[in-house]
From Swiss-Prot:
The lineage of its organism: Bacteria, Bacillati, Bacillota, Clostridia, Lachnospirales. The active site is at residue 237. Gene3D superfamilies: translation initiation factor eif-2b, domain 1, Translation initiation factor eif-2b, domain 2. Its EC number is 5.3.1.-. Pathway: Carbohydrate degradation. It comes from Lachnoclostridium phytofermentans (strain ATCC 700394 / DSM 18823 / ISDg). InterPro entries: Deoxyribose1P_isomerase_DrdI, IF-2B-related, IF-M1Pi, IF_2B-like_C, Initiation_fac_2B_a/b/d, M1Pi_N, NagB/RpiA_transferase-like. GO terms for molecular function: S-methyl-5-thioribose-1-phosphate isomerase activity. Pfam families: IF-2B. The gene is drdI. This is 5-deoxyribose 1-phosphate isomerase. It is an enzyme of class 5 (isomerase).
Length: 354
C-alpha cells in the first residue's frame, strides 16, 4: 500500500487520503498546484518524510507544466511553485528540505536544456523516496536495539509507514521486531484533536498484527504509573541544533510524564528532519490550525458554544533535557546533542556528496 507515488505517466502525484482512514482507503490524484498545496495543508498527506516525498514529486510534476523554454524564465516560474508549496505547512522541515533539494537540481543545471532539467528533477524526486525507504529501515534497526520481547511501548501521533514510505520511524522498530518474531504491547495515544493515533497508528499496528491498545491522551500518566510502559517512541517534524524537538501537540507532555516515572523517551527521525540552522526550539515556528478541529470536526453537532475561543497549535516542542536519545539512520544521538546531531548530519551529507 503505497501512500505517495507518481502516476504511471509521471504527470501527477497519487496519494492515499489519510483523512479518510481507517474507514476507507481512497486514492487522490494531484495534478495542480492548488490540489498539491491542499493535500499537504489539509493533512491528506502527512508525516514529515511523506510530506517531503510528496513535495518532491509535486514540484517535478509542476515543472513539466512550465511553458517557458528559456532558463531564467523557467527558473522564475519554478521558484513560484516552490515557494507556494513551501508555504503550506511551516513546522515540518522535510517540506522545505525536499523543495530546496529539487531547487538545487535546477540551479546546478543552468547550462542544460529544459528537457534535461526535467529528467534530472524526475531522478531526484524518485531518489528522495528510495532513500527514505533505506533510511526508515536503518532507523528501525537502531531503534530495535532498545526493545526487548514483551516490552510495553507508548506512542503519540503517527510515525509509521503512512508518515514515510516504508516501516516508518517511531513504529518502524515495532514492525521490524514483529517480522522477526518479537511481541510488544503498544499503547497508542489517540492524539487530539485530529486523532492520528486512533485513526492511523492503531490502524497500522493492528494491520501488522501487533498488540495495540488505544487510550485517550489524558491516560498516558496512569499507564506509566501502572508499570505498563517500558519506553516511549515518537517521531518528530523538526529537530533544533540543541536537540529540542517539535512534534505533534501533546508530545512534550508525554516526555514530562516519562521523565517523572523514569521511563526512557526516544525520538526517531531521518537526518533531513534535523535543522542545524535552528538553534533551539524557541526558533521553531509552530503552526496554528482551525478552531473547528477542536469544536466540531468529529461531531454531528458542535461540542462547545460557537463563540468560545479555541487555541489549536498543531505542534509543541519537547525540551532536549527530556529526551533519552534521538535515533537517526546514521546512529543514535545522545547529549550533548549539539555534537551528536552535527555528526549525524555530516555523515548524511558525505554520502550525498560522494
Amino acid at each position: 500500500m503505497e501512500n505517495v507515488t507518481l502516476s504511471p505517466d509521471g504527470k501527477s502525484v497519487v496519494i492515499i487520503d489519510q483523512t479518510k482512514l481507517p474507514n476507507a482507503i481512497e486514492y487522490l490524484t494531484l495534478s495542480t498546484s492548488r490540489q498539491m498545496y491542499d493535500a499537504i495543508f489539509a493533512l491528506k498527506v502527512r508525516g514529515a518524510p511523506a510530506i517531503g516525498i510528496c513535495a518532491g514529486f509535486s514540484i517535478y510534476c509542476l515543472a513539466q507544466t512550465i511553458e517557458e523554454t528559456e532558463y531564467d524564465a523557467f527558473l522564475l516560474k519554478f521558484r513560484e511553485y516552490k515557494d507556494y508549496l513551501d508555504s503550506s505547512r511551516p513546522t515540518a522541515v522535510n517540506l522545505s528540505w525536499a523543495l530546496k533539494r529539487m531547487g538545487k537540481v535546477v540551479l546546478d543545471a543552468k547550462d542544460k536544456s529544459i528537457d534535461e532539467i526535467l529528467s534530472l528533477l524526475k531522478a531526484e524526486c524518485i531518489a528522495i523516496k528510495e532513500e527514505d525507504i533505506k533510511i526508515c529501515k536503518a532507523i528501525s534497526e537502531y531503534g530495535l536495539e532498545f526493545l526487548k520481547d514483551g516490552d510495553g511501548i507508548l506512542t503519540h501521533c503517527n510515525a509509521g509507514p503512512l508518515a514515510t514510505s516504508q516501516y516508518g520511524t517511531a513504529l518502524g522498530p515495532l514492525i521490524l521486531g514483529k517480522e522477526r518474531g518479537m511481541n510488544f504491547k503498544v499503547f497508542a495515544d489517540e492524539t487530539r484533536p485530529l486523532l492520528q493515533g486512533a485513526r492511523l497508528t492503531a490502524f497500522e499496528l493492528h494491520e501488522a498484527g501487533i498488540d495495540v491498545t488505544l487510550i485517550c491522551d489524558n491516560m498516558a500518566s496512569i499507564v506509566m504509573k501502572n508499570g505498563f510502559i517500558n519506553a516511549c517512541f515518537v517521531g518528530c517534524d523538526r529537530v533544533a541544533e540543541n536537540g529540542d524537538t517539535a512534534n505533534k501537540i501533546g508530545t512534550s507532555g508525554v516526555a514530562i510524564l516519562a521523565k517523572h516515572y523514569g521511563i526512557p523517551f526516544y525520538v526517531m527521525c531521518p537526518t533531513s528532519t534535523i535543522d542545524l540552522n535552528c538553534k533551539t526550539g524557541d526558533d521553531i515556528e509552530i503552526e496554528l490550525r482551525s478552531e473547528d478541529e477542536i469544536k466540531s470536526k468529529w461531531y454531528e453537532k458542535p461540542m462547545a458554544p460557537s463563540d468560545v475561543k479555541c487555541y489549536n497549535p498543531a505542534f509543541d516542542v519537547t525540551d532536549h533535557n527530556l529526551i533519552t536519545a534521538i535515533i537517526t539512520e546514521h546512529g543514535v544521538c545522545k547529549a550533548p546533542f549539539e555534537v551528536s546531531l552535527r555528526e549525524a548530519v555530516k555523515k548524511a551529507e558525505d554520502i550525498i556528496n560522494k
